[in-house]
Amino acid sequence: MAEYDKLRLEWDCRRGMLELDKIIMPFYLEQFDNLTETQKATFVRLLACTDLQLFSWLFKRARASDTELQQMVDLILEKQGVVINN
């Protein structure tokens, strides 16, 4: 079982784009503790991505080439009740 620095993760959830903050931070605060260890590790990897990548994925402009990252994006959108109509 991995140990996660909660303060560091919360800081990493703060992004340079308000649109991302409104999706990622609430997901972290409400859902992170309920994720599996694999999902937690994937979420941490997702936070290492650029804001531009996250925006593209979360607003369905593109799909992540990494299947695990795309599954996490889909989970975030589902849990946060985000509906993006393209």
From Swiss-Prot:
- Gene3D superfamilies assigned to the protein according to its UniProt record, in alphabetical order: Flavinator of succinate dehydrogenase
GO cellular component annotations of the record: cytoplasm
List residues traversing the bilayer. Answer: none
Q: What GO biological process term is on the record, naming one?
A: succinate metabolic process
This protein's major location comes to: cytoplasm
Q: Which UniProt keywords apply?
A: Chaperone, Cytoplasm
Matches recorded under SUPFAM superfamilies: YgfY-like
Localisation per UniProt entry: Cytoplasm
**Superkingdom in the source lineage:** Bacteria
Recorded family membership: Belongs to the SdhE FAD assembly factor family.
Query: What is the purpose of this protein?
Result: An FAD assembly protein, which accelerates covalent attachment of the cofactor into other proteins. Plays an essential role in the assembly of succinate dehydrogenase (SDH, respiratory complex II), an enzyme complex that is a component of both the tricarboxylic acid cycle and the electron transport chain, and which couples the oxidation of succinate to fumarate with the reduction of ubiquinone (coenzyme Q) to ubiquinol. Required for flavinylation (covalent attachment of FAD) of the flavoprotein subunit SdhA of SDH and other flavinylated proteins as well.
Question: What protein name is recorded for this chain?
Answer: FAD assembly factor SdhE
Q: Which organism is it from?
A: Mannheimia succiniciproducens (strain KCTC 0769BP / MBEL55E)
